[in-house]
Amino acid sequence: MKHYSIQPANLEFNAEGTPVSRDFDDVYFSNDNGLEETRYVFLGGNQLEVRFPEHPHPLFVVAESGFGTGLNFLTLWQAFDQFREAHPQAQLQRLHFISFEKFPLTRADLALAHQHWPELAPWAEQLQAQWPMPLPGCHRLLLDEGRVTLDLWFGDINELTSQLDDSLNQKVDAWFLDGFAPAKNPDMWTQNLFNAMARLARPGGTLATFTSAGFVRRGLQDAGFTMQKRKGFGRKREMLCGVMEQTLPLPCSAPWFNRTGSSKREAAIIGGGIASALLSLALLRRGWQVTLYCADEAPALGASGNRQGALYPLLSKHDEALNRFFSNAFTFARRFYDQLPVKFDHDWCGVTQLGWDEKSQHKIAQMLSMDLPAELAVAVEANAVEQITGVATNCSGITYPQGGWLCPAELTRNVLELAQQQGLQIYYQYQLQNLSRKDDCWLLNFAGDQQATHSVVVLANGHQISRFSQTSTLPVYSVAGQVSHIPTTPELAELKQVLCYDGYLTPQNPANQHHCIGASYHRGSEDTAYSEDDQQQNRQRLIDCFPQAQWAKEVDVSDKEARCGVRCATRDHLPMVGNVPDYEATLVEYASLAEQKDEAVSAPVFDDLFMFAALGSRGLCSAPLCAEILAAQMSDEPIPMDASTLAALNPNRLWVRKLLKGKAVKAG
């Protein structure tokens, strides 16, 4: 069984207040002057003071083995801030730091360690505020208003580097080869790691490490680096520096899931909901020129227009990709929403998912068997549910303490307003009819004979995504649903958390004294007309799940207040994010894929055409991370996701899985 929690660091603080690993019997940083050693070994060893002003790209990527207390990262961040202040017009504008950590510190230990360096406090406090829970995989932290990105990969570095997507190859400008001393932690200092460092290093990229061990120098040379010794810091006689002077051949482990970006920095987004709003922000942060075309007269009139939506992860014991994606998407979403400089109604009150029948109880028991961190999810017994949620249900369940609810409509509107302040152009009542290639661009034809030409296009228009010739074969489907808006009562007002059962019920929004209860589910339907049957069924499902609960019987839907919307979904419950695949070319190129995997070409896609769709019923959870993934891909930057989970988001995945097994593929 796969476990989804990470073992925290086992440490103590010595007489000097320096953290010491009990497992490795080694200090996290020098007792003498760890800050100056970091500046000398890693910043100096990689010549960053000289390279920053001369860097020809807007992004500089640093990778590190062993995050530890974050001293190297914080020191680099401080130096990068000083560089930006001294060189505001430099080409280099953003810093991307990738680090691997098998045993992350707790937030409390991290804060205690940071007390050593008061001068780093402004940066350390931001790191502590966003410190992620101990889940495996990549945790992306957006710091300094997005100018600094930190990708924290929790797990064994030798395992993780073998799981990275090929899109990360040759992206790293500088390596910090750190960690406990080779004699103390030999399992990390392997040839596999050195080979991975070489694969990820950009031609001309550098490395520095505190050790001068001969096997390390030889291993890095064998991997492809040109190595040299340098005077060590303080009492250490020597250290190692290296440079990648050659261009190594790029491996391609799964060409059928290849992701391609664009050298252009101008894009049109088709949409008007949360997906297009968050993607606009992510692209603008990377220097793109972005135009949004919305078919409606205002934003968030589609599936993103609800008054309240629940935020919690979708978990399943039997689907590793789904667990990895949604657990990390959920934690990223909380960090993202908490730092968004816009207002929207929300309450991180927690979400409790209840076992209201034998099937749901079994499902919850399976989720709880996955060894989830308590920060993510904990079991709650039936007698404790009332204390936690405020209402009696006679059911046990699972609680997501960091979950809650938010207003998607308000979020979408205000994010788009923020994006407009940053340069986003929006055109409302522009219904895209079709699009075609013209002179290395996309020609967009709108209703009413309006036309526009753009270098790159992203389709983020929900259930209407498959209405174009390029997307008509996508295996997605529409789901119509109705959410009921009910006035609060004295009993309902006691509800303190979002309840999930065979439906969901939110606490009241203080702004309107109403709750949301829903939602009906009509697969294959796009009907948005009010339904009295749906209104009554929303109420009845609540009563059926909690037949002894008097408060449930008092739910009043008689005023017919409701909202009907249509979602876009997939049968595997995961979004579709990436290049729009070319269906016909895929069938031709991959006709013999099952027998000829070694000869496979890169996935056939439409050039400079991307999609961000099929968010289903968990868009509030998945949209922030999906926007970050797609913006990174489009910009040819590091993507915060391992290869197998990223493949599970690829729009061509359902076709490719069948083709890899030699099975026939049907459109839709």
Curated annotation (Swiss-Prot):
Its cofactor is FAD. Gene3D superfamilies: D-Amino Acid Oxidase, subunit A, domain 2, FAD/NAD(P)-binding domain, Vaccinia Virus protein VP39. It catalyses: 5-aminomethyl-2-thiouridine(34) in tRNA + S-adenosyl-L-methionine = 5-methylaminomethyl-2-thiouridine(34) in tRNA + S-adenosyl-L-homocysteine + H(+). Its main location: cytoplasm. Changing D178A: Strong decrease in methyltransferase activity. It is found in: Cytoplasm. The keyword S-adenosyl-L-methionine applies. The keyword Methyltransferase applies. GO terms for biological process: tRNA methylation; tRNA wobble uridine modification. GO terms for cellular component: cytoplasm. Residues 1-245 are annotated as: tRNA (mnm(5)s(2)U34)-methyltransferase. InterPro entries: FAD-dep_OxRdtase, FAD/NAD-bd_sf, MnmC-like_methylTransf, SAM-dependent_MTases_sf, tRNA_MAMT_biosynth_bifunc_MnmC, tRNA_MNMC2, tRNA_S-uridine_synth_MnmC_C. Its EC number is 2.1.1.61, 1.5.-.-. One of its GO terms (molecular function) is oxidoreductase activity, acting on the CH-NH group of donors. Changing R618A: Loss of activity, but no change in FAD binding. Residues 270-668 are annotated as: FAD-dependent cmnm(5)s(2)U34 oxidoreductase. HAMAP family: MnmC. In the N-terminal section; belongs to the methyltransferase superfamily. tRNA (mnm(5)s(2)U34)-methyltransferase family. In the C-terminal section; belongs to the DAO family. Catalyzes the last two steps in the biosynthesis of 5-methylaminomethyl-2-thiouridine (mnm(5)s(2)U) at the wobble position (U34) in tRNA. Catalyzes the FAD-dependent demodification of cmnm(5)s(2)U34 to nm(5)s(2)U34, followed by the transfer of a methyl group from S-adenosyl-L-methionine to nm(5)s(2)U34, to form mnm(5)s(2)U34. This is tRNA 5-methylaminomethyl-2-thiouridine biosynthesis bifunctional protein MnmC. It comes from Escherichia coli (strain K12).
